[in-house]
Amino acid sequence: MPHNLRSSLHLTSVLALMGCFAGSPALAEDASAMLHRLADAGHRNTASVSEVATATEAQSPFEDLAALGEALYFDTNLSANRTMSCATCHDPSTGFRDPRVDVASGAFSLGDDGKSLGDRNAPTASYAKFSPPFHVREDGVAVGGQFWDGRAMDLAEQAGGPPLNPIEMGMPNEASVVARLQEDDDYVAGFKELFGNDVWSDADQAYGAMTKAIAAFEEGDEFAPFDSKYDRFLRGEYKMTPKEELGRVLFFSQQFTNCNTCHMLKTSPTAEGETFTNYEFHNIGVPRNVATRDAVRKDVGFTDNGLLDNAAIDDPAYRGKYKTPSLRNVAVTGPYMHNGVFADLETVVRFYNKYNSKAEVNQTNPETGKPWGEPEVAETISLKELEQGDALDENRIDAIVAFLKTLTDARYEPLLEQQQAAKAN
């Protein structure tokens, strides 16, 4: 697809978004900023003959690697049926998650073929750049990487996965993706300018260049602005409500909860730049998502092996473990857990509470009215970490949820208001 046509289509999408968010100033401002960037791009692609004549022949249509990556991130031309891009499952307008909830209740993502579904919930791409490369520490704890099982070392390797996954973007091989890239004259020129004239001489080299560009875009501040109420609180720009403050104290307390055992990276609870994950892998006993198994056409007895599906791991002791996700934007990026089994954030907190309270009410899933369900993999559950906190009463559960909502980026705060309005109705 020519770059000017792609920009036109992208521009149409943004105008539609601005209409949708007319009542949400933060999101409308976000869409407006994107509109101006695309308008600039459109002007570049419709420059006069005299302007083109005075430009250097090798001038890149993209100002830098991140700009190229942004174009690639939104390009549906890189999928088999030209219907799916990175942004389809990681939409920047909804917290870089998949906003499509009409299939499998949003637990799994629909592929480019319009029928295939994955087995895991698409994680948010926000703040993903801070995950270290996958490795196993000397103490045997697996850490980092991308995807739920850490199988990609970094963002670039992660970006190379979905285009070739038959149930995602569905392209047969790297060469087919590169051929799609070469349909766009701006890509041809831009890749040469940013990666060298011989970048197109080898399909693997060109494909690798594509993944590096997408990673460069994902490393930008748009994915990790650190401007939530919590961040503003640390800078003295926001005063927490009593409930939010109680939740903050509980979250960082090693006496009353176990939250920060896995969801804290920094050594101080007041350190800026906290990602709210230590990137370790654990099995927390998540039950099977029986309700969605029919949607993915798999037996309800199907077991996801988690970390054991990572080619770098062959020890059964890692079976059923998943990377601890960031809690940044957690309130607006449900459903939750690797299989999307819980729809509501409060349910997640109550699920953790079941390990420290044997009261009947805490052994029941409020979304189903039934017991929580057997864990998908029982033998590797991190009981030591899960059982080290106190039981939470209703007030403390509400407080922790209130605090978690303060981790929402400023641009997504209107989504919280929409959630509240939807629950009220």
Regions of interest found by a model, annotated:
Residues E29-Q158, P225-T364, L415-N425:
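Short glycine/threonine-rich turn/loop motifs
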Residues P166-M171, G301-N305, P366-G373:
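Noncatalytic linker/hinge segments flanking ATPase motor cores
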Residues V361-I381:
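Short glycine/proline-rich, acidic loop/turn segments that cap or connect secondary-structure elements
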Residues P2-E70, P166, P172-E245, V249, ...:
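Post-cleavage N-terminal segment of exported redox proteins
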